A protein has these predicted regions:
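Short, aliphatic-rich beta-strand segments
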Residues: 11, 180-191
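A short linear hydrophobic-aromatic micro-motif
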Residues: 172-177, 215-217
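Internal, active-site/partner-interface "lid" segment
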Residues: 135-153
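Short, low-order "capping/linker" segments at domain edges
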Residues: 226-238
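Short amphipathic alpha-helix segments
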Residues: 154-174, 202
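ATP-dependent adenylation/nucleotidyltransferase module used to activate substrates
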Residues: 1-127, 185, 203-213, 218, ...
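Short, structured loop/turn "capping" segments at alpha-beta junctions
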Residues: 117-123, 130-139, 172-174
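Short, conserved charged micro-motifs
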Residues: 193-203
Length: 238
């Protein structure tokens, strides 16, 4: 919509980082190219942010503060008056320390401010004919590690490879997460897909061992957003 109103006076910005799968960047580049949207890619290194690799409960705050600081600097250097991001009303329902950084930096959240939920955004996207209307929700790869478990480049790569293998396995998984608990990979898929993954347990386990996991487990509760926040004490969510 910004592109329709402003043309090249609006620019889409994507970060390139070890915490985001390469396929996410490729999809962003392809989408902007197909829509004729001006697009910039900024290289970031979240593992160099002080405190990030230790994976504290406010890791997302540290990350958002750094990344959006870079984007704001880009905007100021190139004459853009505002920076927008895509949070929606549903994001209020989970622990989101990154939202504090967004507010502190003065970044605007127009979809959230308009009171739009994820389902409503998908419906509007369908009306506009956007290919992203059915795109599964996604969070950065750092969100696959329990708080307090150190995040490393090797660990991020291991998770990315495991998730990509599941997507390419022919299991027809539209949504999934591989949570890294030390040497154990905990696989989350929607409840309706659990039996299908379990039927190929030996193949999945063998693949995950190739990626460096000693064990592969299937979460019987199924996929849910922010599952690693479930054990976070209430006082840590503030």
């Amino acid at each position: 919509m910004a592109h329709e109103e402003l043309g090249d006076r609006a620019v889409a910005v994507t970060v390139r980082s070890s915490t985001f799968p390469r396929r996410e960047l490729d999809e962003a580049v392809a989408f902007c190219r197909s829509e004729g949207i001006r697009h910039e890619v900024i290289d970031t290194s979240e593992l160099d942010i002080p405190g990030f690799a230790e994976n504290p409960p406010d890791r997302c705050y540290l990350c958002k503060k750094s990344i959006f600081g870079r984007i704001i600097a880009f905007a100021q250097t190139n004459g853009f008056a505002a920076v927008l991001e895509g949070s929606n009303l549903d994001d209020d329902g989970d622990y989101r320390p990154g939202m504090r950084a967004i507010r502190e930096l003065g970044v605007r959240s127009p979809l959230h401010d308009a009171g739009l939920t994820k389902a409503e955004i998908r419906a509007l996207s369908r009306e506009m004919g956007l290919p992203t209307a059915e795109k599964p929700s996604f969070a950065c790869l750092a969100s696959r590690f329990p708080y307090g478990e150190r995040i490393t480049a090797a660990g991020l790569e291991r998770v990315e490879r495991a998730e990509q293998w599941l997507r390419d396995s022919g299991l027809g998984l539209a949504q999934l997460r591989v949570r890294s608990h030390g040497d154990l990979a905990r696989i989350e898929v929607p409840a309706g897909d659990i039996a299908r993954v379990a039927a190929r347990a030996d193949e999945v386990a063998a693949a995950f061992k190739r990626f460096g996991f000693a064990y592969a487990a299937l979460d019987l509760q199924g996929y849910r957003t922010g599952s690693l926040n479930e054990t976070l004490a209430a006082d840590k969510r503030k």
